[in-house]
UniProtKB/Swiss-Prot annotation:
Disulphide bonds in the chain: none
Residues annotated as domain IQ: 114-143
Pfam family, one: IQ
Lineage, top ranks: Eukaryota, Metazoa, Chordata, Craniata, Vertebrata
Cellular component GO terms held in the UniProt record: cilium; cytoplasm; external side of plasma membrane; extracellular region; motile cilium; neuron projection; sperm fibrous sheath; sperm principal piece
Alphabetical keyword list: Membrane
UniProt name for this protein: Sperm surface protein Sp17
Any one GO BP annotation for this protein: spermatogenesis
Biased composition (Basic and acidic residues): 62-98
Gene, per the UniProt record: SPA17
PROSITE patterns: IQ
Length: 151
């Protein structure tokens, strides 16, 4: 029973979403007739695997999910290292030279990637147009056959 306009949010246990995703994937893959019985057998097999290998996929999935959503690696900035000003100037000028070379190299690579992508897009579009024309021809021939049958 739900309460209209309620702001109640239930907390799903860690790893439960991963278990349901795995079950859903297997149901879609196997297409069973009796889904509740299939789910029971699936969870039984997961329990047996967990007991034999001491590996819990739900626990592992919750750790991965936690690491993904709670990644604090980019929140704090490292303080800059202090060194001689002369060394910093030489490092900066060296970096500028290196980046300009890499920019040219990457632009050539980008152009090649863009060309390949353009060819793929054009081929897909041409295929789409050809399929549309084939559909039109097929519907026209079906309509002509129906007209001939009606005569």
């Amino acid at each position: 029973m739900s309460i209209p306009f309620s702001n109640t949010h239930y907390r799903i246990p860690q790893g439960f979403g991963n278990l349901l995703e795995g079950l859903t994937r297997e149901i879609l893959r196997e297409q069973p007739d009796n889904i509740p019985a299939f789910a029971a057998a699936y969870f039984e097999s997961l329990l047996e695997k967990r007991e034999k290998t001491n590996f819990d996929p739900a626990e592992w999935g919750s750790k991965v999910e936690d690491r993904f959503y709670n990644n604090h690696a980019f929140e704090e900035q490292e303080p800059p290292e202090k060194s001689d000003p002369k060394q910093e100037e030489s490092q900066i000028s060296g970096k500028e030279e290196e980046t300009s070379v890499t920019i040219l190299d990457s632009s050539e690579e980008d152009k090649e990637k863009e060309e390949v992508a353009a060819v793929k897009i054009q081929a897909a579009f041409r295929g789409h147009i050809a399929r549309e024309e084939a559909k039109k021809m097929k519907t026209n021939s079906l309509q002509n056959e129906e007209k001939e049958e009606n005569k």
